[in-house]
């Protein structure tokens, strides 16, 4: 397993991370635990999760898997939806309980997909107050955010934080062969993260299999492309031992792609990438959990997303 440094934190994280959503989808809970422990045994130390994944089942299963010494092997990340201080604090404590741990290595604000999100979180009474209090109490170590809708929303979150003299430790976003052509996080956001030494968490390397449906690239090409960017970790969902082995093979065989290889891959995917056809998380509400469940955001919050909010 290859390891990279997570931004300016100094933490060493595996080049591939285990996605938490798919862990809760597996019908057999014991199989989920086996996947998590096998990943850790093979050097994947970055564990992804979220307070809302599968009604908390993803965190519960990961919490069970991290017993018997496995917590010490993991760099554990989870996410919360709460935009206000009270909701965020409650979700942090619920995640800690489900994960059966006294601290989370990286806590991230989930689904930053509205232009109104940055002010709600970073303003007075916002969720950031809960995160900073949790950090002071030793419940969390680092703070980041995630989103999949539009790079301009990410930029607003970053610059709203900079204006308040706060720099996030990590940022998660789609980085893949299609993103490079449409509403690109790679082109707009990645340079800012590199400049400020913020950890880069790549997700949706295969677009939840949508990109594979374009029949232009293989799973290994997708993972190697994302790994060839200045990512700290490429997070991928594994709902079976077979898919986990695919991720391990990709990590084991990875060598940075040359400029000619990248150019050829992008040329191959360009026609299919137009209009975000294979990136529905950017163009539809299908991936917007907080749009469908605005109560997760906290009392009185709207689920409307970019560009409406």
Give the residues covered by each predicted segment.
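N-terminal binding-site loop/beta-alpha segment at the start of enzyme catalytic domains
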Residues: 1-73, 130, 136, 308-309
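A general structural detector for well-ordered alpha-helical segments in enzyme core domains, enriched
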Residues: 2, 31-36, 61-65, 91-95, ...
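Short catalytic-loop micro-motif centered on adjacent basic/acidic residues
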Residues: 45-52, 77-79, 141-146, 172-173, ...
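Structural motif corresponding to the early beta-alpha repeats
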Residues: 53, 68-89, 110-113
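Active-site mouth loops of central-metabolism enzymes
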Residues: 19-30, 77-87, 115-120, 149, ...
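Glycine/proline-rich, positively charged
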Residues: 83-188, 194-201
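Conserved, mostly hydrophobic/aromatic
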Residues: 6, 18, 39, 47, ...
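Structured C-terminal cap/extension of enzyme domains
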Residues: 30, 38-41, 45, 164, ...
């Amino acid at each position: 397993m290859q390891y990279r440094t997570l931004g300016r934190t100094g933490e060493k994280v595996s080049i591939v991370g285990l996605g938490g959503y798919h862990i809760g989808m597996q019908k057999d809970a014991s199989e989920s635990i086996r996947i998590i422990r096998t990943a850790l045994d093979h050097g994947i130390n970055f564990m992804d999760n979220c307070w809302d994944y599968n009604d908390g089942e993803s965190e519960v299963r990961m919490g069970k898997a991290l017993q018997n010494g496995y917590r010490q092997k993991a760099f554990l990340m989870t996410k919360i939806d709460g935009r206000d201080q009270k909701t965020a604090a409650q979700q942090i404590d619920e995640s800690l309980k489900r994960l059966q741990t006294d601290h989370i290595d990286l806590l991230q604000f989930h689904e930053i997909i509205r232009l109104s999100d940055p002010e709600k979180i970073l303003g007075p009474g916002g969720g950031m107050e809960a995160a900073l209090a949790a950090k002071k109490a030793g419940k969390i170590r680092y703070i980041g955010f995630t989103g999949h809708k539009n790079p301009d929303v990410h930029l607003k979150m970053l610059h709203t934080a900079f204006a308040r003299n706060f720099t996030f430790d990590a940022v998660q976003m789609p980085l893949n062969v299609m993103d490079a052509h449409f509403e690109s996080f790679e082109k707009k956001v990645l340079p800012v993260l590199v400049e400020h030494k913020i950890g880069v968490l790549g997700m949706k390397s295969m677009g939840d299999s949508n990109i594979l449906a374009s029949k232009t690239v293989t799973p290994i090409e997708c993972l190697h492309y994302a790994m060839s960017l200045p990512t700290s970790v490429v997070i991928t969902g594994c709902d079976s031992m077979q898919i986990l082995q695919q991720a391990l093979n990709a990590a084991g065989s990875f060598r940075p792609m040359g400029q000619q290889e990248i150019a050829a891959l992008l040329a191959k995917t360009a026609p299919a990438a137009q209009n975000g056809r294979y990136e529905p998380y950017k163009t539809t509400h299908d991936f917007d959990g907080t749009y469908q469940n605005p109560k997760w955001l906290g009392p009185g919050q709207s689920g409307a997303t970019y560009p409406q909010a």
